[in-house]
Amino acid sequence: MAVEVVLGAVTCPSGQLVMMDGGYLEMWSGERVPDDEERPATDFAIVGPDAEAAADSFDRQTGTRLYDIPAHAVAEFTATFDEHCREHGHGASLRAFKQQVPHRERVRHAVAAREPGFIVMGVPVLPIEVPADRPLSVTAVPGEYGWQSMRIEFSDAPVADSWVFGELGVDHARFVFADADALSSWEHVRPLDGLADLILWGRDQEQVAAEFGAPPLGDTADVEYGWVDLPIMEAYQRGLAIETRRNEPGGPKFAFDFRPHSHHWQVMGLVRASEHEAGVIQVGGADIMMAMTSVGDGFFPVHLDVDVDGVPVALRIDIARED
């Protein structure tokens, strides 16, 4: 039997934990109304005597709220819902919110309504009520091809049963486990010190580094090239020039990364330096963890382990199941 590896611990002073793809935290609005001029959208509540039945059979999102419906599709979406209710005999309709619902408020609603999650522009978010008075240990079980599972422990009570809780969709190969209030202080892109790094790697990295005068970063065989601690606008302008070079037909093959000194940069530095690809930083008075999936992107089932009284003991994410 594989031995669990301790990845670290998170704290959750608000008592409400958020789990999602950590690479998408750039979209998190906290207590603010989501504001995306490029992708305007509307949020709806399903109302009426048959609201829950209509939500279940319509099956577009979990619960009786429908978030982030693109503005250009609102009329068609509403007509589709109305037709669905007529066909199924449901007494329900859509009521648009005056403005989009802040992501922090979506967490509050999901926890209070005992809904398993919600979406942020199509990205699954799983919130859950957890103990606020102690650190929550995060462990992982190793397997042949990566982690078999990860587990966030709420108590040391024996597990009597396990329920399907939801599913995490990941496009950036990383999970985040974070206090819902603390995420309102998260800076995903804005540099905290006004600086940024610009890193090059790949097949033709030496050629590109020579062209742009990028120094080596270290002295190992797999060394990368680039600049660290540049003023943000200088790093940005160099990045634009390098991107232009990369996009030239028949040009060199390489990759590069623009890394502003944000909270995301801080925690990913710890992740890259960690044997187990997990890191914890404090933001907004809480310890937040970023942990790589170990298997890249995908959809990962999440289970809720409970004790004999049905009280949650832990959340468990299935990662690389081995048959």
Segment roles from a protein language model:
Residues 2-264, 271:
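Extended, low-hydrophobicity segments enriched in charged/polar residues
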Residues 272-322:
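C-terminal structured interaction module
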